[in-house]
């Protein structure tokens, strides 16, 4: 076995054509080639899958049953393979409890740090807290007035499930006669033992003593306190009742030998790491349970259309709740309140007075309102205060036991920061434990809480800990912890993530950001001898930050690892030790090793399209003319954008043009376009529940008809989804087969030719074409269905043919073949031709959507848009459409974008790729830096204007590519 190479023999996974090659070990190897050529099939579906499979096979059969096992890839054999770790572009899921701090395990170290070095404060007054001794506790209790009745309790069980029979029996044996169980005092009687529900949570506190404050009671009190502290493990509770007030409720006070506030007399548990976890009941905010947000009724969803009147049903929920009687009842409510406020029923909501709208939404308080309701066929007057629409809906939601009703009410709710913890997830006493001495604005407590620390950007947190001065004792306690946190923060700064905040939810990260976080985590792990496989780590990264990313990847290699990167970025390819160029085309036209060697050897290869782009022989040209923004066409104007780090930004987007929004990572691009523009449009036009980002207004949206977001998400999540179903061609194909004479004679309709429903499909495989066989300790095996031979349909359905082909044959046609085959059927020829024009001619009509790359899925969506009748008033939003695209694919993508633009539509593209930016008609460059250093518009104008702007990082790199001479034959030269 070679120690210098990974030797792959006979790789046939997906479209790989019996590929055999040697990949040098302990090197930085870049796999490149057109989208769909087989790069991921080689890197992830062959190399990683086999490395993972061999590792899992080394485990016991018992362990294997708990793991997701990968199928053996279609390859003869692989030699010299190390344990493999894949760092892909997948996001981290939508779990709201997962943040950057928890994902990177920084939060675990922070919990240790705050538990050992944090200074506790009283959450009410901000005064530092100190520990109480047993004597001090006795002194505090003895200050109660003479004749005060009190009980000393020791908590022995807190919020735990179980019967606790042994605990109660032990207390009885020790001589105790009373306990408080779930707030109720009960006697310990052996004849009538206390029985608890084993499935419910309980709190059990033993009554150590019952005392009346008087002279000479101190010795007994001290003895009781010591006993209670021993049983309560350092904690006790005192219930006392004022003298001569036997009917007053008992006042409860917690005392602890750990933390005590002299200002308020309150005691708290000594903080432990668990107290700083928002996933633990000990630390989580009791209102939002550690989520930091909760569902609340949103006035903008309750009154979605402010041009409607009360008479016409401006208050949306009251139009749809219950039957006719309830609708009539709510009409009576609204009418009564409107008359009380002097609000005309026929006036639009937005024209009502502020006072009238406030009363309708929040209630009349103590003021009584006259209501008239029908009772027994006659109107009946009722006088009472009006609780308000919002309190009424909140009460209905809280009281309803009907899941249907609650789901219906959820349509009017959105997520808002929790009022109790202000979105910080933890209990007040844990938020009052701080590090440092600098007082933050609006806080009673000096220093930073763990939530304040997590609200810092990664770069700011790195600086904060760097300036943290430790005493010798503190250094011995937490020096290693701080070093580990700083190391992880430093790695993330190095891969260009310094602008992200530690409390950012993992689900909100882009694929590139999530991947770079995992990359930083792997560097911190310090593993050696591993095969790392990375999927386009440069995605979402500005050119300025590329060098730091490459240095990080080199560090992985220099530690003694083999690093394979699937990448299209020119700088990354040039930095590689070895390049594998897969191609020459995509799909059935790819799967071959076109060239391999150093970047210089790739550039010298006549067969390599990648090499020709690297050498400058081919390039995406600068357009000779651009579409000039015209005032008569109009502009979308975003005024006063202040969401996240945006600093009162005013942005103008010319209609009918291709606009690129650029800037370093974290400068505010996605906030401006996605959080503000898209969310505002989707809420106004489509009733979306997503809250738009903060801004004053967006002008001229009425000049557009609709908004479409085109991303690289899969077009379907099941193998049944394919290009024919997505583009709508399959409906036309089924109608075509149903119109064949034989089908009409047999009475077959279009449904007969669907593989999703009973009738025409093969029932043995239920239209899948394959059968899944579970192998228990091995991964499941998929075998071709014997009944239909993988064709999905039953024999009778396959007997129906059109021009000699049955429905299964049609689904096996490539797009290029379909263009010719359906030349006489306009409804099928046109979409086939569009798919071919966007470079997808190699796809099969019935190819499973799950096998498509991100670039292929995106071009499929663009083709579907091109196939529709163009109205010229559509706003298209694209976020980094060049993800996963080769130079050649970017040229094809631009052709499609130009077609959409030439149809009069408006395209807004968030992009880092300079080839796309240089061909744009208009550029909005944000910056100058990321995070708190960004949020400003550095330049707006043509690419040439941005390139000439001092202080623009984008402009600096744009200058170089704008010098490339335009090609006279390039279609991108059209204005």
Question: What are these regions, as identified by a protein language model?
Answer:
Residues 1-975:
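Conserved phosphate-binding elements of NTP-dependent enzyme cores
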